Amino acid sequence: MKKIKALLIGLVLSFSAPVFASDFDWSQCWCNYGAGIEKGDMLLSVDAALPWNFFDIINANGWAVPHVIADFEIAAPIWKLPFTFGGYAGVSFWGNKDFSHTAVLAGGSATYHVRMPPKNLDLYSGLKIGVKFDISNEYDNGIRFNPDWGYNIGASWFFSDSFGVNVEFGFPSSKAGVVFKF
């Protein structure tokens, strides 16, 4: 019964979208940024992120502080495709009674945006690649370098021309926070 209800709700929503967005040009959604983002705009997001192993650490009698990550991107389309390019940096802390870790990560990112109704919404998907410096008393030399890569799918909702909130799901972490547009 629950599956039938979910299917009916999905059908109603999918068929009602064109009614609520009758003035929306669906043929242009793949080649335009959402939420009024334009070529040359700069986006800065500050987020709290939960890595995939966050609860494994907690369940192993450990402690963890969610990652704090800042992303900076510039809107730079390729041909007609609405991409943003930039970088990210973050820090996190975790451990247990025997050891502690501090991870510092940094790298580059490329994100593809899609415009959908309503006009305040920006949908996107991206790739990130960089390096993670894992500093711990568990290692002989105190530090390890690891690749830091991932993918995500997310959405931003802008309350004004320059401020919004975002949520992102992906690997190796999912995150939520605020985004500023300059």
Name the predicted role of every residue range:
Residues S22-L44, A49-F182:
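Outer-membrane beta-barrel transmembrane domain signature
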Residues M1-L8:
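Bacterial N-terminal signal peptides that target proteins for export
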Residues I9-S16:
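Bacterial N-terminal signal peptides
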